[in-house]
């Protein structure tokens, strides 16, 4: 498909979507208050349209959120329910939702292809095997040098070798340093200049990584964001250079961030209630009900959702835990209430934690513990700190327009409309006339 390079022309819009994983909107909208030296991102406030916040999805984690960003539907509809697959017996060895075939609805890449346009993507989640002309997906397994071989196999044939010869080695997969994002930015510029795609998606991951370690708005987080700001500027400049007068550039994020110092581990309580069993090697051997933890929340899955006794046992257990404020539980959602919010169609319950808390995953130990402070997400999307970001510039996009608080499902149809694409499967609506 590389023979299609050069498909970008003056009559066809170029859409570039850059995701900064974990970017809270107030890094940009309140840049002065935080002392953020981010001139490129600040230009988006002046030059284009932006949201004060984006209400995300359940759970507020990377893979379901990124899939909503390109489909305009909730996880229950697009099928990417969390980062990692539910795997209580560890048969999938902590595998993630890597594969595009698991997405059940059309994406922006599909819409572009249907319109006869070319597509490119770098490090975007859930793109292994996607029908993208120039694709370097996000995937890793062991975090060793062997991962580079895997990435070469699942990327567009020859693309990484060509890029290496032109601009140097790609740094993919589990590498979440700011240096790795700078390399991804260089690859984005190179692909824009040499392949001329009509749609390019780029996922930058270093900010999320450092926020987990050092919390949002820490000195370390600010230093990383300032480096990513330069990447944003270079990619935007390249887009506007190769498609002068018809380049749209969006900066989005998947979720915000909150801090924690406390941990609630649901597993010991479930084990004590005989809801799962553990073998002599300390591994789960069978289960009736299990938490599926994602940072600031946990879905509760039942092996047999129609088993009334198990349902009643779990309901009583969660009610007892939620009654005690020392456990840090904000809300427990059940069945239809959860499903109306578009998350976890296979879950019977959902436990959302208060800010300052995260879920644990050990099968033993205390239910509640004080731990080293860090950053997390994954909680309910209506928590203000977990709101995501949206900024858009391009021809005809109103300058300095504040959209207020928007629904993440509105982003894909908004981008599709601006780029002249059709995405009727989206449940959101275009935000600009």
Where are the model-predicted features located?
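Active-site neighborhoods of enzymes that stabilize oxyanions during catalysis
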Residues: 88, 104-105, 284-414, 418
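Boundary of Sec targeting at the N-terminus
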Residues: 6-8
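His/Asp/Glu-rich, glycine-adjacent segments
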Residues: 74-215, 360
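Acidic/histidine-rich catalytic neighborhood
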Residues: 239-249, 253-303
């Amino acid at each position: 498909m590389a023979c299609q390079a050069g498909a970008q022309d003056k009559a066809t819009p170029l859409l570039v979507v850059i995701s900064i994983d974990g970017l809270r909107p107030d890094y940009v909208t309140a840049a002065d208050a935080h002392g953020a030296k981010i001139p490129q991102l600040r230009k988006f406030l002046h030059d284009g349209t932006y949201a004060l916040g984006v209400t995300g999805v359940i759970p507020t984690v990377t893979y379901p959120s990124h899939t909503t960003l390109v489909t305009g539907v909730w996880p229950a509809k697009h099928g990417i329910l969390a980062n990692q697959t539910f795997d209580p017996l560890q048969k999938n060895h902590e595998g993630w939702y890597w594969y595009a075939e698991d997405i059940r609805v059309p994406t922006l890449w599909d819409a572009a292809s249907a319109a006869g346009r070319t597509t490119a993507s770098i490090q975007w989640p859930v793109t292994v095997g996607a029908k993208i002309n120039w694709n370097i997906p996000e995937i890793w397994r062991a975090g060793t040098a062997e991962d580079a071989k895997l990435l070469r196999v699942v990327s567009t044939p020859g693309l990484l070798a060509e890029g290496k010869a032109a601009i140097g080695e790609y740094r993919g997969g589990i590498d979440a340093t700011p240096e790795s994002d700078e390399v991804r930015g260089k690859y984005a510029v190179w692909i824009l200049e040499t392949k001329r795609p009509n749609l390019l998606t780029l996922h930058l991951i270093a900010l999320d990584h450092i926020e987990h370690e050092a919390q949002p708005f820490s000195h370390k987080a600010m230093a990383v964001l300032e480096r990513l700001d330069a990447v944003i500027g270079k990619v935007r400049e390249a887009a506007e250079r190769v498609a002068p007068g018809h380049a749209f550039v969006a900066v989005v994020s998947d979720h915000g961030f909150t801090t924690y110092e406390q941990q609630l581990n649901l597993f010991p309580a479930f084990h004590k209630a005989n809801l799962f069993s553990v073998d002599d090697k300390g591994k789960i051997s069978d289960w009736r009900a299990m938490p599926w933890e994602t940072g600031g929340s946990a879905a509760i899955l039942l092996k047999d959702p129609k088993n009334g006794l198990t349902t009643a046992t779990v309901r009583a257990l969660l009610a007892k835990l939620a009654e005690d404020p020392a456990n840090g539980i904000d809300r427990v959602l059940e069945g239809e209430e959860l499903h109306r919010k578009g998350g976890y169609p296979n879950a019977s319950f959902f436990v959302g934690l208060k800010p300052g808390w995260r879920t644990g995953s050990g099968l033993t130990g205390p239910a509640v513990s004080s731990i080293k402070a860090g950053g997390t997400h994954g909680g309910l999307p209506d928590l203000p700190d977990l709101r995501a970001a949206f900024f858009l510039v391009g021809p005809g996009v109103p300058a300095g327009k504040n959209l207020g608080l928007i629904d993440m499902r509105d982003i894909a149809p908004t981008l599709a409309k601006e780029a002249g694409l059709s995405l009727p499967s989206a449940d959101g609506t275009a935000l600009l006339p």
